[in-house]
Amino acid sequence: MKVAVNTFLLFLCSTSSIYAAFALNSDGAALLSLTRHWTSIPSDITQSWNASDSTPCSWLGVECDRRQFVDTLNLSSYGISGEFGPEISHLKHLKKVVLSGNGFFGSIPSQLGNCSLLEHIDLSSNSFTGNIPDTLGALQNLRNLSLFFNSLIGPFPESLLSIPHLETVYFTGNGLNGSIPSNIGNMSELTTLWLDDNQFSGPVPSSLGNITTLQELYLNDNNLVGTLPVTLNNLENLVYLDVRNNSLVGAIPLDFVSCKQIDTISLSNNQFTGGLPPGLGNCTSLREFGAFSCALSGPIPSCFGQLTKLDTLYLAGNHFSGRIPPELGKCKSMIDLQLQQNQLEGEIPGELGMLSQLQYLHLYTNNLSGEVPLSIWKIQSLQSLQLYQNNLSGELPVDMTELKQLVSLALYENHFTGVIPQDLGANSSLEVLDLTRNMFTGHIPPNLCSQKKLKRLLLGYNYLEGSVPSDLGGCSTLERLILEENNLRGGLPDFVEKQNLLFFDLSGNNFTGPIPPSLGNLKNVTAIYLSSNQLSGSIPPELGSLVKLEHLNLSHNILKGILPSELSNCHKLSELDASHNLLNGSIPSTLGSLTELTKLSLGENSFSGGIPTSLFQSNKLLNLQLGGNLLAGDIPPVGALQALRSLNLSSNKLNGQLPIDLGKLKMLEELDVSHNNLSGTLRVLSTIQSLTFINISHNLFSGPVPPSLTKFLNSSPTSFSGNSDLCINCPADGLACPESSILRPCNMQSNTGKGGLSTLGIAMIVLGALLFIICLFLFSAFLFLHCKKSVQEIAISAQEGDGSLLNKVLEATENLNDKYVIGKGAHGTIYKATLSPDKVYAVKKLVFTGIKNGSVSMVREIETIGKVRHRNLIKLEEFWLRKEYGLILYTYMENGSLHDILHETNPPKPLDWSTRHNIAVGTAHGLAYLHFDCDPAIVHRDIKPMNILLDSDLEPHISDFGIAKLLDQSATSIPSNTVQGTIGYMAPENAFTTVKSRESDVYSYGVVLLELITRKKALDPSFNGETDIVGWVRSVWTQTGEIQKIVDPSLLDELIDSSVMEQVTEALSLALRCAEKEVDKRPTMRDVVKQLTRWSIRSYSSSVRNKSK
């Protein structure tokens, strides 16, 4: 093509001097000049556009008037690319230009405005950029302007408003922005206005109501705000109205008194409130009505029954209540009826069975009850029936097997009983069948894949029995097979080659026999779950050929033999669980090559030999379970396992000392090395501050228990038993020695008998040692107090040299200029300091002028923050103390605060449940660290989303804890001078008191957790000042028990996943326990961490499984 272009242009150059000789008129010359801007010209044009012609009137795409002047240029979809040249202005008689469906780029030439006779412009479906030229306003004869599907930007040109007879404007699919002109109503002859899929903002202009000729109004997929203008009721000729996917609010103001012409109304994905206008029944031509994902409420109007032409009704994702109106059965043209995710109750009206053309019936996630009317099962046109997450009951009728068009049937999480009709699938092209979490009995129908269309079969959590139909193993279209938690028995099916199965879960049944080697044919499978069965024999090495496998769970069976080394070929494997079997031999060292592995569980088998060093090299491993085997030798170095959270090596034959680099595992929460032959001291554990569970019992450890571990002596004292030489290191005065029924104090000596010291001698030695220690302590304290100030001043002044970091920070912020302010709080102003692209800091300035003891308070904050280190707490980088103020330097968090993410981004930033759960877990870890792992403990005093900062990975970091009071070691709460905290987050006991406690922080955390779940503020405007988020959630939860009425609507789709539903429900319950009025009913933050992480471990496999359904 490039050769053709060059040849054509060369031809033009060589013939430029002969235009006159052959008398090619000026229009022809102008057209040839346009081609010089094209980079790709089709051969049809190069052959047709001949410079030797006298006129271009016979050229391809060109039409002329009677005087041989070009009046039409139509090159639509010819495959031309290049720029649209300014020479177009030479075509003075041009009335119509159509260049749609090509590859034009660059700007639309402003010279197009010189073609004063133009009536029709179509430049759609190209790649034009830049603004729409204002010069187009000079085209007073223009009637049609089509610029859709380009990359145009900038505002709507107001010059177009002066074109008197403009009828159609198509600007769809660009990047136009700014407000729609308020006087757009001046375009009085407009019939079509397409402004959808742009970035327009501001309100919908009320002047649109002046354009009574308007038939099509598309404003969808913009950033429009405010209410719909009531003036739209004036548009009696309107046929299409689409304002979906904006941020419009308020009641729907349309009375629909004069709506005889309207065909389609789409209001979806806005924030409309109130009910639907009853006047909708007047719109007798209405074919489609959509208002899903708004905040509409009240009953569904029965007037829809008057709309006999209505074929599509979308009301999903609102707050509609009451019963489904039986009048809907009169909508004889209905094809698609979607009322899901509301609060509808009662039975499904049998009148819906009269909708003989219905193809899609979606009523899921409501409160519907009773049996599904038999008439529904007789709608022969039905393709998709989605009734899941209701309270429906009864049995499935045999009639359903005659639904020949049925493609998808989802009834999960109801109370259906009886046998699944055995002919289901034999007469239809069924692709999806989901009956999970019901009470079905009997056998799996044998013909579900007889039409070779089945893609997803989900029958988990029922009471099905018998074997898996053999044809499922040969169902090449099957992608998801989930039969978990039934009473199925027999052997596993054999799988043929060229299978498309992606997800395979038969766990929790009674399957027996070997794992078939044919599982190796599932080349696309990503997850295999066969746990909790009675499978026997060896693990087939053919599983090693599953290169896409990510999850393999064979636990709780009676498998024996070795663990095949071929599994190391599954390079994407992230979970391998073969625990609770009879496996033996050594653990393959090749498993260390699985770089994506996050969980390895081989516990409760008979593995022997040493632990392969290669297993301890994975920096992604979170959970390593090797307990209950016959492993021997030393524990290999573990320092590379930086992400490890749980390590279980218990009940083996390990010896030697704990690895010295065990203390480097800063994320470790659970450690169990009990019932081994390990020796040495526990000194390496003293630096692991993240531990929430430890068991080192029944070993040969000696020496003192590190102070950081003594907290476990009360919660789990037996975790230290069976170590006869282990002791507690008591203070010299002996008055504060931790009590333990398991361990003795380290300074307690048994009577040595003859030749030993007398009791008096021992007492004198102890007394002398105590006096010496006291004197040494007093002398050290004197030196410390005497030197503290000078040392501090030296440290501070040393930071203020010309090349110091302080100097650079002040320079970057122009001496703390207000334009760098990114936040202000009760304790200071925060600035953003950018030293370089990879060195961005937050600088907090605390002013002391007029504040008594300000510098002392500053030192307290600095000392507190400076010694606290945790991945979920903001880290102090530097500090400087000056006469009038102090500066603290932190790492800048680019995602701002949790408050910003939840409430200030527009449009709201998408946050799935996994992200919210991680934020909740991280925040809990940080707060638990402050409460239990700092010595003395720290009460934050103002936990709220604004004090939870999020890094680039949305990992939470608690800030502003440096001003917290330091708890006395022997107290649980401390009186402060003033009531501190934020309204809405303060615990009830703190509203009129100055006492702050760890329990107060727990209450505040509960409020934050509710905000994560609901995406509502603690004092949300929707509460109308009558309550706070705790009261609102408790009221709705008590009255309805429906999580869907509480959670952020954007999470509703995820709640389809039963494991997510379970986690969100339990998180809500935990949040309410944290926010109990009575202090002693609240859990500790350590309890909160345990529960949140327990969900993560317990739901790890099931959540992965359900997300893949």
UniProtKB/Swiss-Prot annotation:
Residues on Extracellular side: 21-764
Q: Name one GO biological process term.
A: response to other organism
Task: Cite the entry's keywords alphabetically.
Answer: ATP-binding, Cell membrane, Glycoprotein, Kinase, Leucine-rich repeat, Membrane, Nucleotide-binding, Repeat, Secreted, Serine/threonine-protein kinase, Signal, Transferase, Transmembrane, Transmembrane helix
What is its EC class? Answer: transferase
The segments annotated as topological domain Cytoplasmic are 786-1109
Q: Where is the signal peptide?
A: 1-20
Q: Where are the LRR repeats?
A: 69-92, 93-115, 117-140, 141-162, 165-187, 189-209, 213-236, 237-258, 261-284, 309-331, 333-355, 357-378, 381-404, 405-427, 429-451, 453-476, 477-499, 500-523, 524-546, 548-569, 572-595, 596-618, 620-642, 643-666, 667-689, 690-710, 827-850, 958-981
EC assignment: 2.7.11.1
**What's one GO-annotated cellular component?**
plasma membrane
Describe its function: Possible role in short-day photoperiod floral induction.
The entry's family comment says:
Belongs to the protein kinase superfamily. Ser/Thr protein kinase family.
What is this protein called in UniProt?
A: Receptor-like protein kinase
Query: What is this organism's lineage?
Result: Eukaryota, Viridiplantae, Streptophyta, Embryophyta, Tracheophyta
